[in-house]
A protein has these predicted regions:
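Soluble catalytic domains of enzymes that build or remodel membrane lipids, polysaccharides, and related
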Residues: 1-172
């Protein structure tokens, strides 16, 4: 979690004209979701937990709580508050049930969680567990991007996989 790595200085350097948005992941829960949320809310990051925000120009961002929270809202429920004629981005930490993304007409989904296995040959396992374990894929009318991320789980190294920080310039 960000609070355990004390990343306030790094976060303060981020610049985004329409804001910085984040959803919690499983490690925010493992490390203490209350402490994580408190830390994040003390930064410029907007923490989205089953929340929809509409930006200037109508772009909608849906932030889902993590899959580990069995009480999180369904994507269908979150989409019921959206204008389906406006572009929609979904932030969902774990890339599960991508067919729902397609069915609900999400334009773009960003996920992470997998670390793309972090250490070869675990990447083969993540490729089997997840419909999309890393990178970009078009699913019907939906675009899915799963980042390998910058951080690590367990040992502080990667073998046979790459860290990744993607920058998307989105116009609408």
């Amino acid at each position: 979690p960000l609070y355990k790595q004390n990343m306030k200085e790094e976060i303060a350097e981020l610049k985004a004209p329409l804001g910085i948005y984040m959803v919690p992941g499983n490690h925010e829960y493992y490390g203490g979701i209350s402490e994580s949320a408190k830390f994040i809310c003390g930064t410029q990051i907007h923490l989205l937990r089953d929340t929809v925000v509409t930006l200037k120009g109508g772009l909608q961002i849906i932030g889902r709580d993590d899959y580990i929270n069995k009480r999180r809202k369904s994507l269908k429920e979150l989409m019921s508050t959206c204008d389906r004629n406006k572009p929609t981005i979904l932030l969902d930490h774990q890339p599960h049930h991508l067919s729902e993304t397609q069915a609900e007409g999400i334009n773009l989904q960003f996920s992470g969680h997998t670390h793309h296995g972090q250490v070869w040959p675990v990447s083969w396992i993540t490729d089997k567990i997840f419909e999309q374990s890393h990178g970009y894929k078009k699913w019907g009318k939906s675009n899915i991007y799963v980042s390998s991320g910058l951080s690590l789980f367990g040992p502080p190294f990667r073998i046979g996989t790459q860290s990744d920080m993607a920058v998307f310039n989105i116009t609408y």
